[in-house]
């Protein structure tokens, strides 16, 4: 039997427990004695039998009263608590003046990590993120030069144009980073390697990055209109350099400027002498301004850049301005200057471009003035004009003062064949001025680009190069034409 009623009632039941136990024992004894008495009546006197029966009846009456009292205790509500036995009081605690240390504040719960796909997995948690990045470019090329030109670097060639691997992300509070290693020309080197801080329209960059040298140079090679950039970008030694820069972007305006040293490879050169990194104290100032309004569905781009560099100790190593016959698989240079003692460079350029539906166009002019230790100041010139059209219903991307990625509107496997683009370009380079004869190049180029999926492209390029003052043939002729062709498969993520 379960008796309910709380702690106070339980205490009364426990208090009556010994009494009940005794009565039950006596009744049990009486029950056991009853047959004995019946059997032993012949031996007991009538008075003894009557006394025994009277005692049993008295015990039964007492048991009945105890059951009634027990029922009353367990069924009636408690109004007063029974007096509890005096509790033993513990000794009073000794007073102390040491305050209890407050618990450390709870750490805020971290934001869940989200995974999205942008060519490779991108992990994002709040304002922090990380994404692995890289690219693979495989080239084949053919340079058909006149028979009188003896150069084993011409003809057919194949190469792994670029292999890059790195990562980029955000640390929070506006701080970002990028790190890329590139394998090209049988050497591993750092390319984009920097830390950024963004606040409002401002972006500050510290590390190895491009000093804003022309639209074509700033446009990534995985989103370019041709396999190779304009001739002047290579001839004038455009490259990433170690420095600090700031960019302001608001509305149609992009303003960029920075202070740069030399490229990382030159600064880390372990050679002794003027080519050694420990003696390289060259530096320069670079700036660029872009006005890019949008008129209806047409994106316009107007830009200008100016650059100044003092070579200091690097002057003693000498500088050359030269260019390949378009395809990179050949290391031959058919036009180029001799090694010049350049102590200072001043170069500046103008940019114009548009994107309107399937059409895009771009044009640049660029001047490179080289101050020589001899006192002369030759100025070299380069430029190009290009026009492109998508045979599919796609458009060329543009963002932040430069061309950006095209995403096929109907990719392969998604109801289409991807994006198909046809581009043509006229490219000019003049390396002759003030007694310096480096040669001239007029190039007519055509490119067909198939992009079946985002991040995957296939190129076919053809070029007719018209040279003046180039590497002489056996008969001494320095004016001739060269046919070039190239193909590329590229994957970036």
From Swiss-Prot:
Pfam families: Porin_O_P
UniProt region (Disordered), positions on chain: 96-124
Gene3D superfamilies on file: Porin
Protein name, as recorded: Uncharacterized protein CC_0911
Organism: Caulobacter vibrioides (strain ATCC 19089 / CIP 103742 / CB 15)
């Amino acid at each position: 039997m379960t008796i309910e009623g709380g702690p106070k009632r339980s205490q009364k039941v426990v208090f009556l427990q010994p009494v009940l136990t005794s009565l039950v024992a006596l009744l049990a004894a009486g029950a056991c004695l009853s047959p004995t008495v019946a059997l032993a009546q012949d031996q007991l006197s009538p008075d003894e039998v009557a006394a025994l029966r009277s005692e049993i009846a008295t015990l039964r009456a007492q048991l009945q009263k105890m059951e009634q009292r027990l029922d009353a205790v367990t069924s009636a509500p408690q109004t007063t608590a029974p007096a509890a036995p005096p509790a033993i009081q513990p000794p009073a605690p000794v007073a102390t003046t040491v305050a209890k240390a407050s618990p450390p504040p709870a750490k805020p719960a971290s934001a869940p990590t989200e995974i999205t796909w942008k060519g490779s997995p991108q992990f994002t948690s709040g304002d922090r993120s990380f994404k692995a990045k890289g690219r693979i470019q495989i080239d084949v090329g053919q340079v058909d030069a006149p028979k009188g030109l003896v150069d084993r670097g011409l003809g057919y060639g194949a190469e792994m144009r670029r292999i890059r691997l790195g990562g980029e992300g955000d640390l929070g509070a506006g701080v970002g980073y990028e790190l890329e290693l590139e394998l090209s020309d049988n050497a591993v080197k750092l390319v984009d390697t920097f830390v950024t801080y963004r606040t409002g329209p401002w972006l500050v960059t510290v590390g190895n990055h491009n000093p804003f040298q022309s639209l074509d140079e700033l446009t990534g090679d995985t989103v370019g209109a041709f396999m190779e950039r304009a001739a002047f970008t290579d001839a004038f030694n455009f490259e990433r350099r170690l420095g600090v820069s700031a960019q302001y972007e608001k509305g149609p305006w992009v303003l960029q400027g920075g202070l740069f040293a030399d490229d990382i490879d030159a600064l880390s050169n372990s050679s002794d002498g003027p080519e050694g990194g420990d003696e390289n104290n060259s530096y320069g100032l670079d700036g660029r301004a872009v006005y890019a309004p949008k008129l209806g569905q047409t994106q316009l781009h107007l830009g200008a850049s100016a650059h100044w560099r003092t070579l200091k100790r690097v002057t003693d190593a000498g500088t050359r301005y030269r260019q390949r016959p378009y395809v990179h698989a050949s290391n031959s240079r058919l036009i180029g200057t001799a090694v010049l003692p350049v102590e200072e460079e001043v170069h500046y350029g103008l940019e114009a471009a548009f994107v309107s539906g399937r059409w895009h166009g771009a044009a640049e002019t660029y001047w490179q003035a080289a101050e020589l230790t001899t006192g002369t100041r030759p100025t070299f010139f380069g430029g190009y004009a290009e026009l492109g059209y998508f045979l599919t219903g796609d458009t060329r991307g543009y963002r932040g003062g430069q061309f950006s990625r095209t995403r096929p509107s109907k990719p392969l496997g998604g109801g289409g064949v991807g994006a198909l683009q046809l581009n043509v370009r006229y490219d000019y380079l003049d390396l002759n001025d003030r007694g310096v004869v480096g040669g001239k190049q007029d190039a007519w180029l055509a490119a067909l680009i198939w992009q079946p999926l985002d991040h995957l492209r296939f190129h076919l390029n053809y070029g007719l190069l018209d040279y003046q003052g180039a590497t002489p043939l056996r008969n001494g002729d320095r004016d001739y034409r060269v046919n070039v062709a190239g193909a590329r498969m590229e994957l970036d993520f």
